[in-house]
Amino acid sequence: MRYNDKELQALSRQPAEMAAELGMRGPKKGSVVKRRLVKLVVNFLFYFRTDEAEPIGALLLEHCRVIHEEPNSFSISFLEDPERKYHFECCSEEQCQQWMAALRQASYEFMRRSLIFYRNEIQKMTGKDPLEQYGISEEARFQLSGLKA
């Protein structure tokens, strides 16, 4: 997916769901851990040099895995290239768990599945499709398409 640099910079300035200085090591062999300001905004994880306002990179959190690594650290890898991992070091195990939970819930796919799950629960309780009033109940994006919510 391609993004306009100005759009990404504008998005990076939006209020963050989470933000902290973390240790970060990129996927290149031999890369070292560097302190980065890391911001979660919608489904993007932006990272900044600690003394700069513009991001130096962004990860789109779709089709990715968030994995707990050694104590106080986690990694993000992408399904199309699982060997390419970004490692993050937190100040505590509690902070690590908070980041992992937030990152796992940040993807569009997670939100779509949650909507489908709660839509079905409401329909079971009320007998009515809550999306019907908006005229979108038959749209493909709100269907399971063979996958369980």
UniProtKB/Swiss-Prot annotation:
User: Domain PH, which positions?
Assistant: 15-108
Its domain of life?
Eukaryota
Pfam name, any one: PH
Give the residues annotated as coiled coil: none
Return the GO cellular component terms, semicolon-separated: cytosol; early endosome; recycling endosome; trans-Golgi network
Q: Which SMART domains match?
A: PH
Q: Which residues cross the membrane?
A: none
One of its GO biological process terms is: receptor recycling
Cross-referenced InterPro entries, in alphabetical order?
Boi1/Boi2-like, PH-like_dom_sf, PH_domain
Q: Which PANTHER family match?
A: PLECKSTRIN HOMOLOGY DOMAIN-CONTAINING FAMILY J MEMBER 1, SESQUIPEDALIAN
Protein name, per record = Pleckstrin homology domain-containing family J member 1
Species for this entry: Bos taurus
This protein's gene is called PLEKHJ1
